[in-house]
Amino acid sequence: GFGTGHPDPEHAADAGAGTAPILELRNVSAGYGEVEVLHGVSFQIMPGEVIAVLGANGAGKSTLCGVIAGTVAAGSGELLVEGTEMADMSAHTRARRGVVLAPEARGIFPGLSVDDNLAIRLRTEPGRTEAKERFPILAERHNQTAGLLSGGEQQQLAMAPILADPPAVFIADEPSLGLSPMAANSVFDALAEMTELGTTLILVEEQAGKALAMADRVIIMDLGVVTWDGPAHELDVDRLEAAYLGR
């Protein structure tokens, strides 16, 4: 049920057979120094689900992404991936276990050409060719120094290798930020392709329409707590507006 809000029958059958969540947060609090940003956040995500995390600025969405990826330490609570406690694992260890935070433009080597960047991340010629077919701009700019690309082009260069080997859980924190509409579309196409390959996607996106078009489920946050969690098709306009205005 891609983007319909209904899991497809396969997933539904699995769920009936007691499929374990791929990711579970139990009463997770987190913050920076003395300032707590997340207050007792709990939810489960099933394998293959697409979750849109919505909310006003300051709702704690980026902190949530960081806690799941391991770039922000959880102050308390449990964080389980496929049933394994993960709170003490580094971001690097989590990435090896398949929990990956979308690279920002810093996921590239700015001093090297586009081709050299792809060669480092994609070992095979077919893999590099596929990346350029998926993101034609990388073929056009193949000799250009990566640091001189536009933000959108850098984002596509950072995303390309991940699609060659999609992770189990991909956390995309505002993937369209600063991108032209065309570049944003190619990134969203890439995310959609990932989910079709079975990746569980956690999507934080200012363009709510884009996020909702892809999402099976929506989590709304306000001031560090989850205020709504349900199927995307049940989300009404009033609730959506309230989410962005902070009530």
Where do the model's predicted regions map?
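The feature captures the beta-strand-to-loop junction immediately N-terminal to the Walker
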Residues: L54-A56
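Helix-to-loop junction immediately C-terminal to a conserved catalytic motif
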Residues: A69
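ABC ATPase NBD coupling module
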Residues: A73, E85-R106, R128, H142-N143, ...
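Catalytic Walker B motif of ABC-type/P-loop ATPase nucleotide-binding domains
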Residues: F170-E174
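Conserved ABC transporter NBD signature motif
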Residues: G77-E85, R97, E125-E133, W228-G230
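Conserved ABC ATPase signature
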Residues: T145-L149, E153
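ABC ATPase C-loop
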Residues: I162-L163
